[in-house]
Amino acid sequence: MKCSKYLIALGLAVSACSSSGSSAPTSLTLVTYDSFPTKDSGVNTALAEFTASTGITVRIVTAGDAGTMVSKATLTTGTPEGDVMWGVDNTLLSAATEGRVFDGSPTEVDHGDVCVNYDIAWFAKHGVTPPQSFDDLVKPEYKDLLVVEDASASSTGLAFLLGTIAHSGERWTDYWKALKSNGAEIADSWDTAYYQRFSGAGGSKGDKPLVVSYGTSPPAEVVFANPPRTDAPTGVAASTCFRQIEYAGVLRGTKHSKAAKRLVEFFRSDRFQRELPLSLFVNPVDPKTSLPDVFTKFGVVPADSLTIDPATIAAKRQGWQDQWHQIMVG
C-alpha cells in the first residue's frame, strides 16, 4: 500500500552490526516504491535484526511509484541498480516478466485491495449517502467528487482500471466515458490523489471526498491521527475493491545472488510478515500471521474482491492502458 505520509521516509539505509566472525559481510540494495519506509518502522527493525543475524546489510533505494519502478527496472535489466526488488504487483508482474527483470520467479509477499475511499464527514455534512458501487460513481449526485490515479503510470490507477474491467466487461470503455462525463479527476500518482486532492486524508487541504486508495487506508488514518482518534474518518466502498498482490524477487544480474535469495526468504518469515500491517498497511501473505486490532477493526478485506486472471492481464494490459489514456487524456 501507499503510505508515504503515514511514515517517515527520509533515510536511505537499514544496517546493523554484522554477526561475529563474518570478515566480509555482504551489502544488498533493496529497490522499492517510494512509500516503503526507510527508517523508524517495524519493517526497518526487522531488517536490522536480519543484518545482525546474517551480516548482510540492506540499503533501501526508492524508485517512484510501482509502475515507474518497473519501467526503470526493465531499462536496466541485467545490470540492475539493486539486488532485490520489493513491490511489483499482479497488475505489473507481466511487464516485469516480459522485461526479464527477475532472476527466477518472484515471491508473493503481501496482498491488499484497491478500493474507492470516501470522506465520512463530508458526506454527513452534505446529507449525501456515500457511493457503494462502481455504478454509483457515475450518478449525478457524485459529479465532480472523485479523483483517480493515472492508469497508464500508477499501479493504483491500473488496479482500479482492472477493477472496472472486471465489473463492466467489454463495456468498460463506456463506463470510463461516463466517469469522465461525471467529472472524474485524474492525478499523476496515489500520493497526489490522496494527500493533495482527497478531503479525508489527515492534513490534506483537498476538496475531493472520493479517492481511489486502499481497503486498509482507514486504519492508517487512525494510527497516525494527530490529535489521536478512536474512529476512522474515512470509509471504503467494498464493492469497488480489486485484489492487489505484491511480490519480491532477486534482480537479474545481481552479484550477490545467494544473499539476495536469503533476503527474499526473510520477507516471508513471521518476523517480517507481522510488521507489514502497521508499516505498509497491507495484509501478510501468511494467513496465520496475527493482525493488530486497529487493522482488523477499521480495514476492509472483502471476501469477493474483483480479480482478473494474470494471463489475461499479461495479454491485454497494454492495450487496455492505451484505450484508457485515449478516453481520459486524449
Where are these regions (language model features)?
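Mature extracytoplasmic/periplasmic domains
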Residues: 251-307
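Short beta-strand->loop
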Residues: 103-109, 135-138, 223-242, 251-253
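Bacterial signal peptide processing site
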Residues: 18-20
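Periplasmic solute-binding protein
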Residues: 90-100, 108-129, 157-167, 243-249
